[in-house]
Amino acid sequence: MQSQDIISNDTLVNLQEEYDRTQIQEVLNELNQELIGLVPVKTRIREIAALLLIDRLRRKLELVSGNPGLHMSFTGSPGTGKTTVAMKMADILHRLGYIKKGHLLTVTRDDLVGQYIGHTAPKTKEVLKQAMGGVLFIDEAYYLYKADNERDYDSEAIEILLQVMENQRNDLVVIFAGYKDRMEKFYESNPGLSSRVANHVDFPDYTSDELLQIAKMMIEEQQYCFTEEADKTLLEYTERRMKQPYFANARSIRNAIDRARMRQANRIFASGEKVLTKADLVTIEAEDILKSRLFSLPNA
């Protein structure tokens, strides 16, 4: 077909109507409202959504529309929102008609790999059966490959995944997730897998200011509030915690808030006050954070 033949058809499609009908703006708005920062991630998700929407319009005009590669890789530290974004991505794919159900199934190596011969295939196939029509999110996917373990049955799980990713890509989207450096080695060791993953999204660590915003969102959801001094103390706590081992971004902040709530409850209980105001029950004081052992660590 000549280029002039392709563009000569004067059939029109309405982009705005299609955009409104699929209601993907609702999901994109939720991403912006629910997740602090992560600008590169949000931009990448918008780009993928735009491609899929335009692809949908091309199909309406009977233009060639190669099935876009939808399998993805989410890389980044723990607590950077990978699972939350995967849920939103599943919603977008469902609204645009690329998956039938739109659910997200989160698994790890233990859900896919058996401990003895003949156990891995049925486990992996059962997980895939549950995930069909939706998105399969494999967290810490690099644990599926252990080159130094001859008795490991991971390769069988990977082979089954490869077959399904290739042959049933209209029924299932797979997202592999984990630390960036480990995921890169995982793909190097499994070139067949790497070639089937078209979209790579890197999740940056949060800044201390972004983590403070996240903390405020979390306590508002639980109907608590910080005093001005507690605000400053939590920021100092966050900056110290970021330098410590096993820091997990928003996950570590959630844990810190849970402990601050416990200290607040104990402070109120120990005060012996018989009558409490609403303010007493909702206010987190600086001392509720300062009692963290982090402030007693040398060089913390």
Swiss-Prot record:
Its main location: plastid. PANTHER family: AAA-TYPE ATPASE FAMILY PROTEIN / ANKYRIN REPEAT FAMILY PROTEIN, AAA-TYPE ATPASE FAMILY PROTEIN _ ANKYRIN REPEAT FAMILY PROTEIN. This is Protein CfxQ homolog. Necessary for the expression of RuBisCO. ATP binds at residues 76-83. It is found in: Plastid, Chloroplast. InterPro entries: AAA+_ATPase (IPR003593), AAA_lid_6 (IPR041627), ATPase_AAA_core (IPR003959), CbxX/CfqX_mono (IPR000470), CbxX/CfxQ (IPR000641), CbxX/CfxQ_RuBisCO_ESX (IPR050773), P-loop_NTPase (IPR027417). The keyword Metal-binding does not apply. GO terms for cellular component: chloroplast. Keywords: ATP-binding, Chloroplast, Nucleotide-binding, Plastid. Belongs to the CbxX/CfxQ family. Transmembrane segments: none annotated. SMART domains: AAA. GO terms for molecular function: ATP binding; ATP hydrolysis activity.
